[in-house]
């Protein structure tokens, strides 16, 4: 625990569950992971490979239901983020044959993505979304994503709490360039976006001018190993725009601290990046218990 710091440590990036690439059984290993790494509060979401809406019978360690289960198990320390497939929506209009193009298409009308948006936040109690455009194969500024974000804005108002959207933003495909992320985030100023990896490695040269003017987007230093990638953004927009996570269990918490220590020189700034900034933005109430440990009260 970071009992000697002014702010709790809030790690923004941890994959939990079981898939072909991961065996992080959160029920058993999450709290030891956090305690060993000095993490007070942890944002968790599904492993990218195998992510789905509803937890299936064959694997109880994937799905948004699993993330909600972990959040319920550790409510004082964990917030969960949902994964939603933007392609599970009806087309709305014909694209083919040519003579019907643009006309209403009503053969498929159920919208599973929008349904899951409501279920994940209002029923399961999750705190937002994790989006991986590259891994899951969608342009982050596609109209299918925009429809989810439009609905999420409404759901946020219904839930009466600030939600967060963690976006894989390494600029490692045309689906998640700085420019594409800027294009969609500027249209949803009510939503809080965390730009995971802060454009490292391919987007570092345009990070500050594209994302910097958008106050609803935070630079998330998760596995951003090159200080020069974020140097201009730090100089122009200040420490208040930065947060960080571990990218566990694929990276270690020590990597996170090395990045933060190498970028921010004062203890006050490091404390803001490690937890203060995201807690202020989300507005989640927290307290310090008699034993010195921090606890969420949301």
Where is each model-derived feature located?
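Histidine-centered catalytic micro-motifs
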Residues: 9-19, 166-170
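Acidic-and-aromatic substrate-binding clefts and catalytic sites of carbohydrate-active enzymes
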Residues: 18-26, 50-62, 86-93, 105-111, ...
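Conserved, mostly hydrophobic/aromatic
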Residues: 13, 34, 67, 71, ...
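Divalent metal-dependent hydrolysis catalytic cores, especially in the metallo-beta-lactamase
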Residues: 14-15, 28-56, 78-85, 127-128, ...
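Active-site gating/metal-coordination segments in enzymes
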Residues: 57-165
